[in-house]
Amino acid sequence: MERIFEALHEVFEIAEDAEITVEANPGTVTPEKLSAYRKLGINRISFGLQSADNGELKLLGRIHTYEQFLESYEMVRKAGFTNINIDLISAIPKQTVRSWEETLKRIIRLKPEHISAYSLIIEEGTSFAKLYGEGSPLERDLPSEEEERLMYEKTEEILDQNGYHRYEISNYAKEGMECRHNLGYWERKNYLGLGLGASSLLDNRRYSNTENLREYTECAGQPEKIRKKHRASDGGRADGRI
């Protein structure tokens, strides 16, 4: 990571107050890693928690427990980070409206600056779709449409009551702690994606790098050769997917 940051500073002028986020899996952070992140200028940590219920985490195939997340969260705070996001997912198999409310309340008590609350989307062709997709044997374990609707309403209600305002489809923040990265998508600002399969939006046109590793490495330094897809944008707001 240090080499990546060195390369970025060589090519780009990075603002002193830039928002620099690292995604972290609960249970994988260490004081040493966090110290190194701070030295590199990283100032925001985003945890992929998904749920505060260990049973739901197991159904999602997550390797961490809620207790491990709490340890990691405390570690990040002790390291001096003052901007933390927590990702959550509703409509998980066997999840109830009450268990979703409990997850929200547990997270609120931790007082993170930002919460991303997504509804589960089952992608076709995935192993998860084979288990829970339409017509699958475990489809019945998914919350009903009415339960999903209630979860959505409870999300906004509970978070709003606790000082988190909704500023984008699935994102809630304390005042002034909105994620600049998310706002960039929403406001259709230019962004540059670096790496295999990365996407960019430049002058209202989308680009996607090749997903072929050999092609990518052989054409390093020649962006016109690794950008395999491009199309004019419709000019509407982005939904956060690329």
Language-model segment annotations:
Residues 1-242:
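C-terminal scaffold of the Radical SAM
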